[in-house]
């Protein structure tokens, strides 16, 4: 149950009557006429998707909360009383009137694991703080799991006489103990709403005796939670997320110093690792993913102008096998990974990003995995999974607009709470919103609202149109900035959302800080409409 008491009192005291004024102007009515306009209001808030029922469900929840405070309001459907403060509260609640659903579609979790994009982290134990404090900690692992990350990466090195530690090679910061990391993963991997499998990717430079010790530690920590491949059974397809609920999968990424041979499968150049490995260690590795090399790597770069045979074969390959992308070099700051949308449109399941990566890429990653209730698994579109009559899909050929998204930004609120100490010290901020689409090249677009000068609660009322050829691969981003004449514009919040999950109607869009932490009050009142 959402506690609205504090929010309601704050909005009563501070929020202007702009939204009620908007409805008055739109319908040419007065306060007494507002109840008669309620069916239109609910229609704006409702969605055609029966599973959401956002308008009525939120109305009933508001009714229960207000009645618990002895506030005189009847259910919205009764059409008896509708007071403007309640309408204000409903519209501006990011919990009661969200832009996307927070429900996991469990019925869609029965396909093979390779049919999903998986929320993946890189160097999961990095704090990103290499100036003050420890560079490595279990806290980033815990935070990542709480945010829905399902792939955790650990680098294992020998430590002392027969010990094993977690840290990158050629780095002499105080390392982490492997057992400490395993315990943190076990404790935070699963909740009632995040029960789908967690994959631990291990990169090791260990001799067979230490590999055997790692196997014992994994078995002792996780026990029956560890997924083991049945050596007597040849699987054509990997089990589904539903079948692997509350399971730990171990994936190994051997160091580059091991010898490798090149093989070609479906036209895709693969890396085959060879080297001395403990048999028990091999048995605990139940998950295998290849990484880009040769033409496969070229297909995922950003400078490809025309599709080649290798790009089609990448998509064909990822229909039933796993592909993981990561930075090309060790230096994460100097060489960021491929753009996430480039890899997603080729069907790559795991795009690894770290806290040291560009913030814009992190926003896209966070936006993609807000889909499906934030469970960390997003089903690929059908056109990435099945070959059509003309062969394997390729997203930049023969684009045809299939849907048009219209986005109207009415107003925003909350900056005086979340950003007062950083902006508007000498005067009120000059805020504007940047709206962009990330997806296949034909769909990508960036637009800005006008700058609203000297406003803590700006009103824009501007509409933007985005023709989309592949909406299932599109993400919409909102970035708010305080306009500056002589210095870079100051960041004032952002969010990224999967376009396919948007609920039509007037929605309260919550904003986040640069690292994806939710702002306490800042939001945009926005309308989404499909045509």
UniProtKB/Swiss-Prot annotation:
Please give the residue positions where the record annotates the modification Phosphoserine.
Answer: 276
The PI-PLC Y-box domain covers 265-385
Q: Which domain of life is it from?
A: Eukaryota
Name the coenzymes or cofactors required: Ca(2+)
Q: What class of enzyme is it?
A: hydrolase
> Which reaction does this chain catalyze?
a 1,2-diacyl-sn-glycero-3-phospho-(1D-myo-inositol-4,5-bisphosphate) + H2O = 1D-myo-inositol 1,4,5-trisphosphate + a 1,2-diacyl-sn-glycerol + H(+)
Q: Where in the cell is it found?
A: Cell membrane
Q: Give the tissue specificity.
A: Expressed in leaves, roots, flowers and siliques.
Task: Indicate the principal place this protein occupies in or around the cell.
Answer: membrane
Q: Does the keyword Metal-binding apply?
A: no
Q: Name one GO biological process term.
A: lipid catabolic process
In its UniProt entry, what is this protein called? Phosphoinositide phospholipase C 9
Q: What does UniProt list as this organism's lineage? A: Eukaryota, Viridiplantae, Streptophyta, Embryophyta, Tracheophyta
